[in-house]
Amino acid sequence: MDKIQETFLYMLKVERNFSEYTLKSYHDDLVQFNNFLEREHLQLETFEYKDARNYLAFLYSNQLKRTTVSRKISTLRTFYEFWMTQDNSIINPFVQLVHPKKEKYLPQFFYEEEMEALFQTVEHDNKKGIRDKVIIELLYATGIRVSELINIKLKDIDMNLPGVKVLGKGNKERFIPFGEFCRQSIERYLEEFQPKQLANHDYLIVNMKGDPITERGVRYVLNDVVKRTAGVNDIHPHKLRHTFATHLLNQGADLRTVQSLLGHVNLSTTGRYTHVSNQQLRKVYLNAHPRAKKGE
């Protein structure tokens, strides 16, 4: 990998606070691009618009989804934009390339009864269960990203309000309140688990060895809980984020408030995460439409 590409990835990690999974996607996109350059005998510095079009055609020839192609092109466009700030002689060959439209989809979320099933599955009488419950409670109660969760420190938790301060994308801080269930879960965790596992750090969530938990560790915890939960077949951290937003909207929260809680700069971004369930749509329809209910 070229040195400027390594500098680019370092910038994304340090300055933009990208998660390890996002960084891996950027890294893999650059590696694939470099392989294309080598195969076609092209140079990074002299790569042109016509070459960018050929690369786009190459990606589509691999039967990739439009969403994946869009991300890969976005990675390269962002990389060249960064390179231009370091070298005035560089031109971005992807700036005029027509961006493939992303496929639209409704984000998956858990129904309230499914969330209750998850909480019931978590063991409550051992250290691992106490820790696992805090992870799920925080992700569901606040809608934070896993990259934000694993970086929460003890000083970031306010048990009086209660709420938590997190460092989001672009190193932007925000405060998210949480409810009594989450507060009690954290309180028990701090009393019975965390102090005994604390090493030379002040991170809130730790693994069973007492070290700060990783994103991979959080995903392992979630998958383990799902395997033992009847009626729940799939989970990923962002699904809990979708669930957080969906449940708030279903209970009447306004979009601007949800935007602030999620840490989104643009309201349009929040729209991708927040949608109402079919049950909620029917409930609103039945209550609002004058001819929705027969005989009334």
From Swiss-Prot:
<keyword id="KW-0131">Cell cycle</keyword>
<dbReference type="GO" id="GO:0007059">
    <property type="term" value="P:chromosome segregation"/>
</dbReference>
<feature type="active site">
    <location>
        <position position="169"/>
    </location>
</feature>
<keyword id="KW-0132">Cell division</keyword>
<feature type="active site" description="O-(3'-phospho-DNA)-tyrosine intermediate">
    <location>
        <position position="273"/>
    </location>
</feature>
<comment type="function">
    <text>Site-specific tyrosine recombinase, which acts by catalyzing the cutting and rejoining of the recombining DNA molecules. The XerC-XerD complex is essential to convert dimers of the bacterial chromosome into monomers to permit their segregation at cell division. It also contributes to the segregational stability of plasmids.</text>
</comment>
<feature type="active site">
    <location>
        <position position="264"/>
    </location>
</feature>
<feature type="domain" description="Core-binding (CB)">
    <location>
        <begin position="1"/>
        <end position="84"/>
    </location>
</feature>
<comment type="similarity">
    <text>Belongs to the 'phage' integrase family. XerC subfamily.</text>
</comment>
<feature type="active site">
    <location>
        <position position="238"/>
    </location>
</feature>
<dbReference type="GO" id="GO:0051301">
    <property type="term" value="P:cell division"/>
</dbReference>
<dbReference type="GO" id="GO:0006313">
    <property type="term" value="P:DNA transposition"/>
</dbReference>
<dbReference type="InterPro" id="IPR011010">
    <property type="entry name" value="DNA_brk_join_enz"/>
</dbReference>
<dbReference type="InterPro" id="IPR044068">
    <property type="entry name" value="CB"/>
</dbReference>
<dbReference type="InterPro" id="IPR010998">
    <property type="entry name" value="Integrase_recombinase_N"/>
</dbReference>
<comment type="subunit">
    <text>Forms a cyclic heterotetrameric complex composed of two molecules of XerC and two molecules of XerD.</text>
</comment>
<keyword id="KW-0963">Cytoplasm</keyword>
<dbReference type="InterPro" id="IPR011931">
    <property type="entry name" value="Recomb_XerC"/>
</dbReference>
<keyword id="KW-0229">DNA integration</keyword>
<feature type="active site">
    <location>
        <position position="241"/>
    </location>
</feature>
<dbReference type="Pfam" id="PF02899">
    <property type="entry name" value="Phage_int_SAM_1"/>
</dbReference>
<dbReference type="InterPro" id="IPR023009">
    <property type="entry name" value="Tyrosine_recombinase_XerC/XerD"/>
</dbReference>
<feature type="domain" description="Tyr recombinase">
    <location>
        <begin position="105"/>
        <end position="286"/>
    </location>
</feature>
<keyword id="KW-0233">DNA recombination</keyword>
<dbReference type="GO" id="GO:0005737">
    <property type="term" value="C:cytoplasm"/>
</dbReference>
<dbReference type="InterPro" id="IPR050090">
    <property type="entry name" value="Tyrosine_recombinase_XerCD"/>
</dbReference>
<dbReference type="InterPro" id="IPR002104">
    <property type="entry name" value="Integrase_catalytic"/>
</dbReference>
<feature type="active site">
    <location>
        <position position="145"/>
    </location>
</feature>
<dbReference type="GO" id="GO:0003677">
    <property type="term" value="F:DNA binding"/>
</dbReference>
<dbReference type="InterPro" id="IPR004107">
    <property type="entry name" value="Integrase_SAM-like_N"/>
</dbReference>
<dbReference type="Pfam" id="PF00589">
    <property type="entry name" value="Phage_integrase"/>
</dbReference>
<protein>
    <recommendedName>
        <fullName>Tyrosine recombinase XerC</fullName>
    </recommendedName>
</protein>
<dbReference type="InterPro" id="IPR013762">
    <property type="entry name" value="Integrase-like_cat_sf"/>
</dbReference>
<keyword id="KW-0159">Chromosome partition</keyword>
<dbReference type="GO" id="GO:0009037">
    <property type="term" value="F:tyrosine-based site-specific recombinase activity"/>
</dbReference>
<keyword id="KW-0238">DNA-binding</keyword>
